[in-house]
């Protein structure tokens, strides 16, 4: 069976290294190349020797070449690089999977950019988180008069706030309540007047330690609190989820997809 050639943008970041190792261990895929910035001292070196796995692909500094040698490209970087990848993917007509987070990525309307390729963007490739989002949507619909609060704990280096995962849960709750997401949120710590009604979704953010990822969403009434929790025990779950998503996406027709689309197709 022919293996799917997967190119990785940002291959030497934390997530990139996990992806290199996970893909290299797969019977269905292989790393075609990994992109690093021009001038990086690892350009031309074998990724397996850098990461410590069985991978013969090399680190390169040409985005165009990465797309040329890949069946699909995966990127977990930043919004500016994501835009560059979208333009190149459209030019080369190659599928693109993005896990880039942050406000700029969250506000992008990908349908304005994607015309000729299958494209999947998500702020969390964990199957558990995306299943939780479905449960949250249903809970928000049924518990229509409960207050909703989202809390997260991440490592001290986490830049975006609230995190992409918190926003996934918030969007799910807003969808369950049938209210616009942007109007249904405030960040805890602002004046209490910010909570205008039960459809306002609150966010509380904590930072500390070096390798934490914990999310809770609470539905609170005067009489009870229902608490959903997702805790990451091993960050390899993101690499596993990204590989599964890439192997699914490469077979899809052009369009903008979500993790929900992939999970629905598997039902």
UniProtKB/Swiss-Prot annotation:
GO cellular component: cytoplasm
Active site: 154 (proton donor/acceptor), 158 (proton donor)
InterPro entries linked: DapB_C, DapB_N, DapB_N_CS, DHDPR_bac, NAD(P)-bd_dom_sf
Transmembrane segments: none
Sorted UniProt keywords: Amino-acid biosynthesis, Cytoplasm, Diaminopimelate biosynthesis, Lysine biosynthesis, NAD, NADP, Oxidoreductase
GO biological process, one term: diaminopimelate biosynthetic process
GO molecular function: 4-hydroxy-tetrahydrodipicolinate reductase; NAD binding; NADP binding; oxidoreductase activity, acting on CH or CH2 groups, NAD or NADP as acceptor
Binding site for NADP(+): 37
Pfam family name, one: DapB_C
Localisation per UniProt entry: Cytoplasm
Residues at which NAD(+) binds: 10-15, 99-101, 122-125
Annotated catalysed reactions: (S)-2,3,4,5-tetrahydrodipicolinate + NAD(+) + H2O = (2S,4S)-4-hydroxy-2,3,4,5-tetrahydrodipicolinate + NADH + H(+); (S)-2,3,4,5-tetrahydrodipicolinate + NADP(+) + H2O = (2S,4S)-4-hydroxy-2,3,4,5-tetrahydrodipicolinate + NADPH + H(+)
EC number: 1.17.1.8
Gene3D superfamilies from the UniProt entry: Dihydrodipicolinate Reductase, domain 2, NAD(P)-binding Rossmann-like Domain
Pathway terms, separated by semicolons: Amino-acid biosynthesis; L-lysine biosynthesis via DAP pathway; (S)-tetrahydrodipicolinate from L-aspartate: step 4/4
Residues annotated as binding (S)-2,3,4,5-tetrahydrodipicolinate: 155, 164-165
Function: Catalyzes the conversion of 4-hydroxy-tetrahydrodipicolinate (HTPA) to tetrahydrodipicolinate.
PANTHER family the record matches: 4-HYDROXY-TETRAHYDRODIPICOLINATE REDUCTASE 1, CHLOROPLASTIC-RELATED (PTHR20836:SF0), DIHYDRODIPICOLINATE REDUCTASE (PTHR20836)
HAMAP family, sorted: DapB (MF_00102)
Database matches in NCBIfam families: dapB
UniProt family annotation: Belongs to the DapB family.
Name listed for the protein in its UniProt record: 4-hydroxy-tetrahydrodipicolinate reductase
Organism: Ehrlichia canis (strain Jake)
Lineage of producing organism: Bacteria, Pseudomonadati, Pseudomonadota, Alphaproteobacteria, Rickettsiales
Gene: dapB
